[in-house]
Design a protein with these regions (language model features):
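Non-catalytic accessory regions of SAM-dependent methyltransferases
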Residues: 1-93
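Non-catalytic substrate-recognition/targeting regions of SAM-dependent transferases
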Residues: 79-90, 110-185, 194
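S-adenosylmethionine
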Residues: 1-24, 102, 154, 164-171, ...
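Conserved hydrophobic/aromatic pocket- or pore-lining residues that grip, position, or stack substrates
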Residues: 94, 173, 192, 209
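A short interface-forming secondary-structure element
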Residues: 93-106
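Conserved SAM/SAH cofactor-binding pocket of Class I
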Residues: 195-218
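Short, surface-exposed beta-strand-loop junctions and turns on beta-sheet-rich folds
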Residues: 31, 104-106, 181-182
Length: 218
């Protein structure tokens, strides 16, 4: 049951049947996921500074775990795993490709995008553009419009070709982030490709149903 008035996308507290606080998330009664939890701290204030701290943590974690080379080609934000429900951010060198799949995240994406650009640049990283790949049907289920295109922000480009060359596991790829599946390349499979390469070494292997050929190239 819901107590009090709300609009879809608003932050709401979730409590147990005994009134115990369980977490806070954004509400959307159009979605099959009624509430997406973003925090389990009742003292959090969900302003721009809150999301900036979350972005800072995600960036620092990647840099520590992946090192400088892989950091230029990786998934910077991985949805709920980074406590950003419904948000994917992939970095392809100087291009950030995003996908927003929840109404609550859509309403707060400007804060997150601004934090990404500013914090990456503070770290000495170049960011030329943000390209949104919101051309997915799940957005319709969230009550959101589908679409794709360059995100408009001062200092970002909006006239790039849609292709970028990346290096992953010492292999170069031409990524089509405008027309390729999802964000253009499955960066979340980076370590699976490394594992497959070890298993396949010295063997003849058939790569079926390939998208970019990344598993075979490894």
């Amino acid at each position: 049951a819901v107590e009090g008035a709300y609009q879809n996308g608003d932050m709401v507290d979730v409590v147990s049947n005994k009134g115990r606080y369980l977490g806070t998330g954004w509400m959307n009664d159009h979605s099959k996921i009624r509430v997406r939890i973003i925090s389990r701290n009742a003292n959090d204030t969900f302003d721009e500074a809150f999301f900036r701290r979350r972005v800072r943590y995600a960036l620092d974690y990647r840099r520590t775990v992946m090192g400088e080379t892989d950091y230029r080609c990786c998934r910077l934000i991985f949805g709920e795993a980074d406590q950003f429900p419904g948000l994917t951010v992939d970095r392809f060198e100087n291009i950030l490709v995003t996908q927003v799949l929840s109404l609550g995240m859509e309403r707060r994406k400007d804060w997150v995008y601004r934090a990404l650009v500013e914090l990456l640049r503070e770290d000495g990283e170049q960011v030329d553009a943000i390209y949104e790949r919101n051309d997915v049907t799940i957005r319709t289920l969230e009550g959101l419009e589908q679409g794709k295109g360059f995100y408009q922000m001062e200092g970002l480009k909006t006239d790039l070709s849609g292709h970028v060359t990346i290096t992953e596991n010492r292999i170069k790829y031409d990524v089509d982030y405008m027309e390729g599946q999802k964000t253009g390349f499955f960066l979340d499979q980076k370590y699976n490709r490394q594992a497959a390469a070890k298993l396949a070494r010295g063997r003849r292997v058939l790569d079926c149903f390939t998208h970019t050929g990344a598993f075979a190239l490894n």
